[in-house]
């Protein structure tokens, strides 16, 4: 722009040049020039447009060999911008054509200085080279290669010659026309020729070549547009007309061909092609007036346009009108082919070839016949394969392969047949052959991936990794599925280990691979719930429900999730969000189960509250149901009503002969009734294929155990225990693990049983994470008011076994005594106890030692230092010496106990005057709700020093030892307590009482009581009751004289007491506070003071016979008070204390106790309720 403006200004400057000093008139001319220059500045755009037009005229002149037009245009261009590289290049080409090589070289040098990187310079340099003999020779060689069909070599020669910059004009057209002969570069060549055409309008040779290339490439509209450009040129019009007509004259007769002729005639009005077109147009219009011909032509046109499916009716009409028209028959075959109707297509092509074997369309028909035969056989093979007719499918694929052995789909079909036959080797071979024939056959890639996936995920992954990117994309669903399977397997392993949070993270990754997956979301939510992340778990399922509100699968999964987290009512409500008409069988089954659960839940609440009859009535009101019938049978079985249970099971089997639950129930009844032979027969008859659930297998294992088949029971439990661990928490899996643990403990594997109880805690949803240490484990055994029966059972069973396996050491000190007469009944005693308890077999063994010190005070003496108390023989002859009466000794004992048996053997304190071996054995069991214990024993009477350890008569008298009374006998005790508000107990015992130098005696004692639980909670109980005791001793030997026993022994004793007891425990404390008020009546007969005359010296026997202990009766009130408290200091150490105050008539001493207990394994479970301090061995 600036150059153009200055040039105009220069035209108006003084003749002396720009540096000349203008005169007045010169100044005016200069100012005028400046004004004109400024005024012409906005016209720069027009000048540029004019410049372009002039350059186009230069190219037009070059193309038409109009050198005069070139000269005129260059003159004007050089006035506008003489330094424009394009202008210089055009002048360069002009001089070169004129043979002025020197002038051309000067311009080339100038162009090198002005624009050395420009295309104008590069193409000019190439043109200069071509003007040399060597350049012309190289150009001729390239042209010869192109003419003789060596296109690639020709292009290489051109590129070497042009160095990437072909000269402008005809050589550029020549070069790109040659490049267009290469199919891979045709599009590039056409684009370059179009660019040249855009800047070189009127170049007929270029436009001719470009139009032909566009038509050959199927770009007809663009080709006709170029011909329209040619038609504007008088020199190119004739050629354009000929090319145009050549493109339309052979079109099938149709409306489209008529329109094409009409469009042509609007462009051209003279010439041979125009005459021919007019005649052809007239003829086609006449033909199209015939409906049959129109249908034929329109059908053929549609087929040629690839829309044969729409032309079938028209072509059928044409064939019906002219049955010898082979072209119409062939076109109909093409139409069927395009519609995919291979069978009809084959028939039409065969017909066309038979009608016109020498038709110009023969090659096309034969090719299409081959293609359609091939794909027809492929379709038939696919259909046979889908119908699982593998032999027929194989025949079709083999026939297809014979038709065309170059296409891969017949080989692929053979691979699919081999796959269906599970012939993996053949399938792999065919699939690999398919890929060698066509690496892009994604079905073969998929077939191999699935084949390797069946063999191992690792092999499939390795195969996928070896694929190209495009092949891998074609089976990305399989790759995602493999990754999903891998993550699912890892998650399942973590779930089996109770690592719910880690499993949930893997499910998150699975959900990213398959967004919106119902069951992946379900498993993710379930694991989050188990990990304690309840809000997140619920949010996942809510989001799924929002995404798929009407999806039955979602509704079922959400209901299952809610049901699995003990939200049956919410689960049922969610199922009802979907219209029942859309419920599938899964939803129907779940809804029925949830509704049944609600009924059973109500019935169980009634039963648990003691209203079993009402519970049964509720169930019997429901529609007949196998589940309810089995529940009623189970209840009858539990209460021992085997006849009713058997009848219920028989009723179920009458409706469902193969019901395994009922069959197992009958096995259990036979076992309960002792009919082991029938039970074994029933157990053997169970259909193994139907015992699929782990709960059924659990019941089978228990039956095997009860029948004594320990090996079979072990096999069953070993099989189902890992399955139960792998399952999500459920009642079924928890029951399996609970019973497996009990079995392991019973068969001598207590430590393994404890580990299984840990798994049972997870399965019962007591904890989401398996406990890893004793403190955590035992803390989980603590009771919870919210627990159902199963959780309570798992906790208590685990606690019982753990404590049975623990080693305990207890040290206690008991101070006890009662007031009386110094020297024999004013008792003050200390007992220090040490007991070690350890596991042995299925019970606990213990070692016990008691250090006992008993002091009964001092005798009061007269002035002579003598005493005549009713002790020894002092009433016969005053005694002297041995005023202080005390004794110390140590006892030892060992024993063992389990749930049924208990025994011990030991000694009375060694060091006492009388030492004996003592002990006992007992057996406990249940008869329905009634518990009972039978016992046999030899126990000391420890209420006085005389009765327990014996005393020695004063040495001033006989010096005889006597006392040490032992009770030898047995008894039975009964109890009734179902855990409800009321309880009853009773005890009956009989003993032979004997001692060293003591008159023999015997006794019978009856004791019974009733209690009512005012508060009956897991950790707090308040009871009030009524107790009754009736005793009878044959003789009253309560005196302390020689031959007496020193123990309370009324001939009649009756008492009633009202005890009140408060027991409670907290996390680390446990206590019992209680007391009673009582009324008692007793009667004693008058008895000889010295019942054994052989112990009395002869001199005193007459006097002794005259002395008696007077009888009589008495009655009155008494009371007791008791306080006992225990504290857990650590998991291993416990301390406690107790106070027991007695104010009664039965020689019962009061106690003060302190103790400490050590647990080797540690215990963080429930505190004992009430606390269990040591009891002196003498009082067992």
From Swiss-Prot:
GO biological process terms held by the UniProt record: cellulose biosynthetic process
Database matches in SMART domains: TPR
TPR repeat residue intervals: 85-118, 135-168, 292-325, 326-359, 374-407, 408-441, 484-517, 626-659, 694-727, 734-767
Family matches, as InterPro entries: BCSC_C, TPR-like_helical_dom_sf, TPR_rpt
Keyword tags: Cellulose biosynthesis, Repeat, Signal, TPR repeat
GO annotation, cellular component aspect: outer membrane
N-terminal signal peptide: 1-45
Keyword Repeat: yes
Pathway: Glycan metabolism; bacterial cellulose biosynthesis
A Pfam family the protein falls into: TPR_19
Family statement: Belongs to the AcsC/BcsC family.
NCBIfam families in alphabetical order: PRK11447.1
Its biological purpose: Required for maximal bacterial cellulose synthesis.
The protein, known as: Cellulose synthase operon protein C
Annotated source species: Salmonella typhimurium (strain LT2 / SGSC1412 / ATCC 700720)
Name of encoding gene: bcsC
